[in-house]
A protein has these predicted regions:
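Catalytic nucleophile-loop/oxyanion-hole region of alpha/beta-hydrolase
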Residues: 36-38, 65-95, 99, 264
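Catalytic active-site module of serine/aspartate enzymes centered on a nucleophile-bearing elbow/loop
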Residues: 244-277
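Short beta-strand element of the alpha/beta-hydrolase
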Residues: 26-34
């Protein structure tokens, strides 16, 4: 992958990366990573995309990976949406006639949904994996209420545990690699980010009927980190005439890092092929 640094609106340095296929790209794919991780964990996804003829672009969110900022934190969900738009605007003019697809996982799927709702006319299709659309489904109401109270006092306090890395994938090597990776965040989720995710999930749920573009919605049936009910809700409420829901038995949260990852990756590639034919 080719890497670069993007200067965000507030002057922060954000890590970006891209890979181009041999020859003219069939389409552009923006890959949006999740909470506490970084875009380097999607190298195999990006490789698969470019080998199939797609140009793949990605970045580390503010506070994540090799980008600047307090680890695993931003003040509100507008931050990654603005950063993504600035990044897209930096490469889109080079490919004005190519369709743009967005592929997001976990918190990145929620970011992708909010981003698509804001810029739907500019996007040809959306692929989401493990989307926390029902963000509070796995959190006790007491913790949710406590989070909102603490947000006014200690917004950067690490509060919510999301579980250990063993719940990411049924492949134990994935969890071990996550734990050993110096660019991943292993602490508890900070109060304000948890509140921002919950608020954004509520806003996205209310606006799901506005989605009209092609959708591929994916979730592991064995996901205990993010309840699959959110992905089912996207499928039920989106107005898109072209929408597909894939629930994968025996897969956990990171379907693209599962033992059967080739199944999920194959579904992504085949769906893209169908929508660029």
């Amino acid at each position: 992958m080719q890497t670069a640094t993007m200067i965000a609106g507030d002057g922060s340095k954000l890590f970006t990366a891209y890979r181009l296929p041999d020859g003219e790209p069939r389409a552009l794919v923006l890959v949006v990573h999740g909470y506490g991780e970084h875009c380097g964990r999607y190298r195999h996804v990006i490789d698969a995309l470019t080998e199939r003829g797609y140009a793949a672009f990605t970045l580390d969110h503010y506070g994540h990976g090799q980008s600047e900022g307090l680890r695993a934190y931003f003040d509100d969900f507008d931050r990654p949406l603005v950063d993504l738009k600035a990044y897209v605007d930096s490469f889109r003019p080079q490919y004005p006639d190519k369709p743009l697809f967005v592929l997001g996982h976990s918190m990145g799927a929620l970011i992708s949904l909010a981003f698509t709702l804001r810029h739907q006319a500019e996007i040809s299709g959306l692929i989401i994996s493990g989307a926390p659309v029902n963000a509070d489904a796995n959190v006790s109401p007491l913790i949710v209420a406590l989070g909102y109270a603490l947000n006014r006092i200690v917004p950067k306090l690490p509060l919510l545990s999301l579980g250990d890395s063993s719940i990411l994938s049924s492949d134990p090597e994935v969890g071990r690699a996550f734990d050993a990776d110096p660019l991943t965040y292993k602490g508890n989720m900070r109060v304000r980010l948890g509140v921002a995710i919950n608020d954004t999930a509520k806003a996205v749920r209310e606006r799901l009927p506005e989605l009209q573009l092609p959708l591929l919605i994916m979730h592991g049936e064995g996901d205990t980190m993010v309840n699959p009910s959110g992905s089912k809700l996207v499928y039920e409420r989106a107005s898109s005439a072209d929408k597909t829901l894939r629930i994968y038995p025996d897969m956990y949260h990171e379907i693209m890092n599962e033992r059967q990852r080739d199944i999920a990756l194959g579904d992504i590639l085949n769906w893209l092929d169908l929508h660029t034919a």
